[in-house]
């Protein structure tokens, strides 16, 4: 898991491929990918951001959900609902059958909501969930509660339940969102932080509504630009026959090797990469913590997946060649110092109290700053953000 996350960060495309496009099988004998139905595509970005699906969802999304998967899913729902800090109630869920049928999944999700004093929760699973729009039934209005439930169906129910209750309580991360209107033209400007932490998902309904209302969504970089990402990958790696060890001190190289091992890689796993590429990646890793989602979906990556799955036109204000060229043009001395500082932050985060005092102090300062930044971002408080950034 850590190794995969590191590779995605180096590629600059963490979860950017969470789009409803056909996957290519590695071999002709590999099972055909399980793609989401059209009606569920719009639910993918939020489901992934909240950990309801992972990178391998095309191997199971159309299969009947297992008991283990359902348990993990309801655990995520429970954690998200707990963050709302709603008044609790003595839930009467005795006799509810929890299994892998649609009705059983509905009961499992209902149990998590029934622990709180929510309007309509006393009406029972079916009435409560249909009232919220979590379960919508087939064209004839049937809920098909006895039918086996696919993972896709359970995922959508769980995602809709979380969003419905967050929206009902005016909750969710508001982000730094501005709106400008000129005649018939409306422009939304959303400032993002290129990370996932502080339980940032789900985003507030106002942010999702702004996305829904937009025709064009423009980013710093186009996360769907495969040629640009390939160019960035070339800039990040040595092509002259040298390796990282030839460009940094032996002491720093030994620390990079230790970091590679901590991420489940071979000691020489980073040999191909330039110091600036590793520095930016360790910088992101050092700021993640136990509030980072399982998929570590950066906010801009979520916005991209949401927009692409909704059929929005995607644009960008910079190119990979421009941005990568800036980093690649840094002096060798600056790159080494940049890597040293970023790696120190990662080591402090990784080693905790076992790190030396300087590393602990650096890690703590970084964590406090990024936590304050996310708090300000979630509260839509630009003044608070300016104080800590």
Outline where the language-model segments fall.
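Short, low-structural-confidence N-terminal segments
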Residues: 26-30, 168-184
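Solvent-exposed, polar/charged alpha-helical surfaces in well-ordered, non-transmembrane soluble domains
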Residues: 41-45, 68, 72, 103, ...
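Surface-exposed patches in mature extracellular/periplasmic domains of secreted proteins
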Residues: 56-60, 168, 267-273
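Structured, acidic catalytic/metal-binding patches in enzyme active sites
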Residues: 176-389
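Gram-positive cell-envelope targeting signals
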Residues: 1-27
């Amino acid at each position: 898991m850590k190794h995969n996350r590191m590779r995605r960060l180096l590629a600059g495309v963490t979860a950017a491929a969470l789009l409803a496009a056909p996957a290519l099988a590695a071999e002709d004998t590999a099972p055909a990918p399980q793609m989401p139905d059209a009606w569920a595509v719009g639910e993918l970005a939020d489901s992934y951001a909240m950990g309801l699906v992972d990178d391998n969802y095309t191997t199971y999304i159309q299969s009947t959900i297992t008991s283990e998967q359902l348990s993990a899913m309801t655990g995520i729902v429970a954690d998200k609902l707990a963050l709302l800090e709603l008044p609790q109630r003595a839930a009467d869920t005795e006799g509810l059958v929890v299994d892998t049928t649609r009705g059983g999944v509905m009961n499992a999700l209902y149990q998590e909501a029934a622990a709180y004093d929510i309007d309509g929760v006393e009406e029972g699973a079916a009435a409560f969930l249909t009232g919220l729009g979590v379960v919508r039934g087939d064209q004839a209005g049937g809920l098909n509660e006895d039918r086996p439930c696919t993972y896709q169906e359970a995922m959508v129910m769980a995602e809709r339940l979380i969003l419905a209750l967050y929206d009902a309580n005016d909750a969710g991360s508001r982000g730094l969102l501005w709106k400008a209107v000129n005649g018939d033209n409306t422009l939304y400007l959303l400032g993002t932080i290129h990370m996932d932490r502080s339980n940032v998902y789900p985003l507030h309904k106002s942010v999702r509504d702004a996305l829904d209302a937009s025709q064009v969504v423009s980013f710093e970089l186009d996360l769907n630009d495969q040629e640009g990402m390939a160019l960035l990958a070339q800039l990040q790696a040595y092509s002259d026959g040298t390796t990282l060890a030839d460009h940094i001190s032996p002491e720093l190289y030994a620390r990079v090797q230790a970091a590679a091992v901590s991420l489940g890689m071979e000691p020489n796993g980073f040999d191909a990469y330039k110091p600036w590429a590793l520095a930016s990646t360790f910088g992101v890793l050092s700021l993640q913590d136990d509030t980072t989602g399982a998929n570590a979906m950066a906010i801009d990556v979520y916005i991209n997946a949401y927009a692409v799955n909704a059929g929005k036109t995607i644009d960008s204000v910079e190119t990979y060649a421009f941005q990568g060229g800036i980093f690649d043009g840094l002096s060798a001395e600056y790159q080494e110092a940049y890597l040293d500082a970023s790696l120190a932050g990662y080591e402090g985060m990784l080693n905790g109290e076992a790190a030396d005092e300087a590393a602990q102090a650096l890690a703590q300062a970084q964590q406090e700053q990024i936590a304050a930044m996310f708090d300000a971002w979630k509260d839509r408080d630009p003044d608070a953000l300016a104080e800590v950034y």
